[in-house]
A protein has these predicted regions:
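Active-site-adjacent substructure of cysteine-protease-like catalytic cores
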Residues: 7, 22-32, 68-122
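A sequence-level detector of short, solvent-exposed, charge-rich linear segments
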Residues: 34-38, 79, 83, 270, ...
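Low-complexity, compositionally biased segments
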Residues: 20-23, 39, 106, 122, ...
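C-terminal end-of-chain micro-motif
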Residues: 1, 275-276
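Cysteine-nucleophile protease catalytic domains, especially the papain-like/related folds used
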Residues: 1-73, 247-248
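Hydrophobic, Leu/Ile/Phe/Ala-enriched alpha-helical segments that form helix-helix packing faces
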Residues: 18-22, 60-67, 84-85, 211, ...
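Predominantly the structural core of cysteine protease catalytic domains
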Residues: 47-99, 142-173
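Noncatalytic regulatory segments and standalone regulatory/sensor domains
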Residues: 112-275
């Protein structure tokens, strides 16, 4: 079994467990570093994403295509999932654990009327390594629509890493602009709560995780300082102008440093033609 080795990496550990089924021995952090995950930022609608939140075929194939695999996604209605899984082990899907979060698990087959899953977890966690769920229990943890991911073998092909990297600096600058606009205007508690996930998470949670993965301590420490200032304000649940209480200049300096690192990686890949 492959374990989670960095924060929120259950889908990347799940990908490692899918590959393990096919005889490919790799860890989630190796996948992340190979595809330059710490330097990738993206936007989906109003939400910005980075690090372990970049998941699914678009991102997993950056690693998979060069080694001869493709990530297939099937979008199913909740009622279709159980019958589909029976014929398609191994397969990865997300179980709803709270109204705000899901946890990626890997279906490995059925036993005694139960559905068995690898529970992608940290090695030192006391959680079970295998989840066994009845059909009723499984359905209770599924969204109305479920994406099930599987691997198929293909001929090795180049990845789209260059394009994904090239777009990241612009996305990060757009995120910086939105954060500054948001922080310098009075915001309601509801707006602050939404921004915590849509605007701040890519830097102050997943961004810190990615910098720690790189052992890049200085910008990570600065971002942790800003996070420590921000979270009590949002938890207080009061209308506020965030820039009056957080060090926006420190945050902007950290973003600029992060942006410079991404540009350096983009230049390296352009000059060397490096690709996974």
């Amino acid at each position: 079994m492959k374990y989670m080795t960095f924060n929120a990496s259950c889908s990347y550990a799940g990908l490692a467990n899918l590959l393990d089924w096919y005889g490919v021995d790799v860890e989630d952090r190796v996948i992340a570093l190979k595809i330059e995950l710490p330097y990738l930022f993206a936007r989906e609608g109003r939400r910005y994403l980075s690090g372990p939140m970049l998941q699914g075929a678009e991102w997993f194939d950056l690693y998979l295509h060069p080694i001869g695999f493709n990530f297939i996604e099937r979008r199913l209605e909740r009622a279709e999932v159980c019958s589909f899984l029976k014929d398609h082990p191994p397969a990865m899907l997300g179980l709803r654990v709270t109204p705000e979060s899901k946890h990626a698990v890997v279906y490995t087959g059925g036993r005694g009327g139960e559905y068995c899953f690898i529970n992608n977890k940290r090695q030192d966690s006391t959680e079970p390594e295998t989840l066994r769920l009845t059909e009723t229990a499984l359905l209770s943890h599924l969204d109305k629509t479920v994406v099930v991911g599987m691997l198929e073998k293909i001929g090795p092909r180049p990845s789209a890493l260059h394009d994904r990297l090239a777009g990241s600096p612009g996305v990060l600058l757009a995120l910086q602009s939105e954060i500054n606009d948001f922080c310098t205007q009075q915001q309601t508690p509801a707006a602050q709560a939404a921004a915590l996930n849509d605007l701040f998470r890519p830097l102050l949670l997943d961004g810190i995780t990615m910098l720690e993965l790189l052992e890049d301590t200085e910008p990570a420490a600065s971002l942790r300082t800003v996070r420590a200032q921000l979270l009590p304000l949002i938890r207080a649940g009061r209308p506020t102008v965030l820039s009056e209480s957080i060090d926006l200049s420190l945050l902007n300096a950290s973003i600029r440093a992060y942006h410079d690192r991404i540009k350096q990686i983009c230049l390296y890949h352009t000059q060397t033609g490096a690709n996974p």
